[in-house]
Curated annotation (Swiss-Prot):
Signal sequence annotation: none
Cofactor(s) demanded: Mg(2+)
Binding positions (Mg(2+)): 44, 83, 113
Source species: Alcanivorax borkumensis (strain ATCC 700651 / DSM 11573 / NCIMB 13689 / SK2)
Gene: panB
Stated name of the protein: 3-methyl-2-oxobutanoate hydroxymethyltransferase
Binding positions for 3-methyl-2-oxobutanoate per the UniProt entry: 44-45, 83, 111
EC top class named in words: transferase
């Protein structure tokens, strides 16, 4: 059975959880979807883990289209979310062009990084049959503006701004949210306050779903792992088992634990 946005909306309504992993090719797309993971994110994180870049900024739309096509060919029924890359949402015209290319490549939804200013684009995309996932908190495409990879919403003003932006985008018709590196209490509050399902990464177990970069949860990314990462490969010794263990841990609430949150 294919997973749709309605599946994830009902999961939230019923108080259940769902899992998301990144994939960039047909082989891993198949393995991840066969493990029961509800959604696959074709992330611009491919810049880091596939291309060896130091950020996601160099990733192009053409590259995102190519990897989305690859993932779509291997997918066995998971919902496919594709990132609109750096500067892809600089104007409404660019956003529409990028969304068209990614949806025609096989995505079921596009993901935009930003804040309340995304509302107009989300409304227009919705009218044209394109569901949107809004990525808030730490937005890696803005790493140069943020001054590094830092937890967002730590002080009262930052928290209020994030919560207000989430409500605005929820009203605009956002289908899903991703909260990255947002304090646990704030992540839980946003999850309660918005109708759309919320996916966490370095956020809170109270979020409706969780996402990790595949290479991180397999323990094969270079460098020191982020606080929110758990190495499921080390626990299982097998990739298929690692994907299943991750899915199980998200759904039974054992991941993320306190040590994975801020």
């Amino acid at each position: 059975m294919s997973i749709t946005i309605r599946t994830l909306q009902k999961r939230k309504q019923d108080g259940g959880k769902f899992s998301v992993l990144t994939a960039y090719d047909a082989c891993f797309s198949r393995l991840i979807s066969e493990a029961g993971v509800e959604a696959i994110l074709v992330g611009d994180s491919l810049g880091n883990v596939i291309q060896g870049q130091t950020s996601t900024v160099p990733v192009t739309l053409e590259q995102m289209v190519y990897h989305t096509q690859c993932v779509a060919r291997g997918n066995q029924g998971s919902l496919i979310i594709a990132d609109i890359p750096f500067m892809g949402a600089a104007t409404l015209e660019r956003t529409l062009n990028a969304a068209t290319a990614l949806m025609q490549a096989g995505a079921n939804m596009v993901k935009l990084e930003g804040s309340a200013w995304l509302a107009e684009a989300i409304e227009v995309l919705n009218r044209n049959g394109v569901p949107v996932c809004a990525h808030m908190g730490l937005t890696p495409q803005a790493v140069n503006s943020l001054g590094g990879y830092r937890v967002q919403g730590k002080d009262d003003d930052g928290a209020a701004e994030l919560l207000n932006a989430a409500k605005i985008l929820d009203q605009a018709g956002t289908a899903l949210f991703v909260l990255e590196c947002v304090p646990r209490a704030l992540s839980a509050e946003i999850t309660r306050e918005v109708a759309a399902p919320v996916i966490g990464i370095g956020a809170a177990p109270e979020c409706d779903g969780q996402v990790l970069v595949m290479h991180d949860m397999l323990g094969i990314s270079p460098g020191k792992p982020a606080r929110f990462v758990r190495n499921f490969m080390a626990e299982t010794g097998d990739m298929r088992a690692a994907f299943k263990a991750y899915d199980d841990a998200v759904k039974d609430g054992s991941f993320p634990a306190d040590e994975h949150c801020f």
